[in-house]
Amino acid sequence: MPWLQVRLAITPEQAETYEDALLEVGAVSVTFMDAEDQPIFEPDLGTTPLWSRTHLLALFEADTDETALLAHLALLTGGELPEHHIEEIADQDWERSWMDNFQPMRFGRRLWIVPSWHAAPEPDAVNLLLDPGLAFGTGTHPTTALCLEWLDGQELAGRQVLDFGCGSGILAIAALLLGAERAVGTDIDPQALEASRDNASRNGIEPARFPVYLPADLPRQQADVLVANILAGPLVSLAPQLTGLVRPGGLLALSGILAEQAEEVREAYSAHFDLDPTAEREGWLRISGRRRAD
């Protein structure tokens, strides 16, 4: 069945008004999209940011009366409609289309992230099974990719790893598949902990090798390797805590950092770590290093 799609060019201030109005006139879905390829890197806590120029897409049943729809929408919003476009779009298997667009990804020499419905391109490689669509990290974001590539380049055999802000558990699970003896994950979101457990099970990892905790319950023991893919602000404020969680001689990898934030993050860790050159991908950075002996 085809659909009628209405596209409106709006500002953030208009978003709620037009979203409510579109739903009231019968939209079966409403989606916000970036109209000008404007990135939003680190929004303030408690905010739901939108782009300065946003496209609002609404889908209606194909037999919807376009003239009546626009007239009713203008009445509800109290004035002339912004720039808009209406077109008929064909129905399709949206789930299949989404699945076809997600292919296995390689990180470093050995590691692949492979969706569960796809055959591993290199069966003898280190293949981590993980599906896209989670809110917690699937390897597609540059910060996750930076951390995965770093892990692939380390000698992890027999190491104890801490994934701070574990999300989907992708980094800890990758470390275990790459040879780490044990990994611990921590996250402020209970749903992230559940996602980590599920993904570990999917990859054949026993719960004892990858326990996960809320921060308040995290055992105070030092790790051989700590990875933290969060954001620059928390990385700076948590520097004393994260430093204390890495044993002398242990390794640290931090991401979620923009270029203009790198100096502050490096300064927060330079007193205790010999830091490597900064790595960059698509505007995001990774800072890594080795903790000096006390």
From Swiss-Prot:
Catalytic activity from the UniProt record: L-lysyl-[protein] + 3 S-adenosyl-L-methionine = N(6),N(6),N(6)-trimethyl-L-lysyl-[protein] + 3 S-adenosyl-L-homocysteine + 3 H(+)
Please tell me where S-adenosyl-L-methionine binds in this chain. T144, G165, D187, N229
Q: What is its EC number?
A: 2.1.1.-
Q: Which UniProt keywords apply?
A: Cytoplasm, Methyltransferase, S-adenosyl-L-methionine, Transferase
Which is a Gene Ontology cellular component entry for this protein? cytosol
Cystine connections: none
Q: Does the keyword Cell cycle apply?
A: no
Its BP terms in the Gene Ontology are: methylation
Query: Keyword Methyltransferase: yes or no?
Result: yes
Q: Where in the cell is it found?
A: Cytoplasm
- One GO MF term: protein-lysine N-methyltransferase activity
Any signal peptide, and if so, which residues?
none
Q: What is its main location?
A: cytoplasm
Recorded hits in Gene3D superfamilies, A to Z, give:
Vaccinia Virus protein VP39
The free-text function statement in the UniProt record for this protein reads:
Methylates ribosomal protein L11.
Q: Which family does it belong to?
A: Belongs to the methyltransferase superfamily. PrmA family.
HAMAP family the UniProt entry points to: Methyltr_PrmA (MF_00735)
| Protein's UniProt name | Ribosomal protein L11 methyltransferase
Q: What species is given as this protein's source?
A: Pseudomonas paraeruginosa (strain DSM 24068 / PA7) (Pseudomonas aeruginosa (strain PA7))
Cite the source lineage: Bacteria, Pseudomonadati, Pseudomonadota, Gammaproteobacteria, Pseudomonadales
Q: Report the gene name.
A: prmA
